[in-house]
Amino acid sequence: QGMRRLTGFDAIADEEGFIVAYPQGIRRGWNSGPGGTPDDVAFLEALAAQLQARYAIDPDRIYATGLSAGGMMSQWLACESELLAAIAPVAGTLPTPSADACARTRPVPALFIHGTEDSIVPFGGGNAGPADGFRPAEENARLWAAANGCGTAFEVEQLEEAAPDDGTTATRITYAGCPDAGAVHFYRIDGGGHTWP
């Protein structure tokens, strides 16, 4: 129920005509890395197959997003499965062992969002508790862009403030030279914490 309330996706799905699902990992977490249990990649693939059998879902238009561990899981699912058309992780960079083990065989478009003041999954990387070290947020996006076949150049754009009183600003970084099916955007939320934008 938390992500349903936080994202407001139900209303957007009704308005735009798409189906949204809110899977929940065991103990509010996900196995977003090599080995271990449960096999959350298999779980999410099975969930997608069940939804496709029940509803008219275009198999080429399945997307994943998530906050924190959910954002990490969206990336790991794209690393391990051909299921997704694109991802949009929020405040969730892959732990270094997962990033090193990512074996994507095709470009997967991505839109990353991360706050510079995130104290749970630090923007600058490193550790924030018992988890393995996280890659810095901008490096995580850059490495994804490189794996997609994008060039090293990027465009930086300061965005208009949607909520001038919230103490944050947003900057969009768009990687250049990406293949048509491999665009990568990174939204840096200056002053933003570990939260949904």
Residue ranges and their predicted role:
Residues T105-A110, P179-V184:
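Short, proline-enriched alpha-helix->beta-strand connector loops that line the catalytic pocket
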Residues D118-V121, H194-W196:
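Acidic catalytic loop of the alpha/beta-hydrolase fold
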Residues L83-T93, V108-P109:
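A conserved short beta-strand
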Residues G133-T169:
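Acidic, glycine-rich loop-and-strand cores that form catalytic or ligand-binding grooves
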Residues W76-A85, P95-A99:
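Conserved hydrolase catalytic core segment
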Residues Q1-Y63, L67, M72-W76, E80, ...:
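Serine-hydrolase catalytic machinery in alpha/beta-hydrolase-like enzymes
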Residues R4-D10, T93-A103, D166-Y175:
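Alpha-helical scaffolding within the catalytic cores
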Residues F112-H114, D118:
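Short beta-strand/loop motif that positions the catalytic acidic residue
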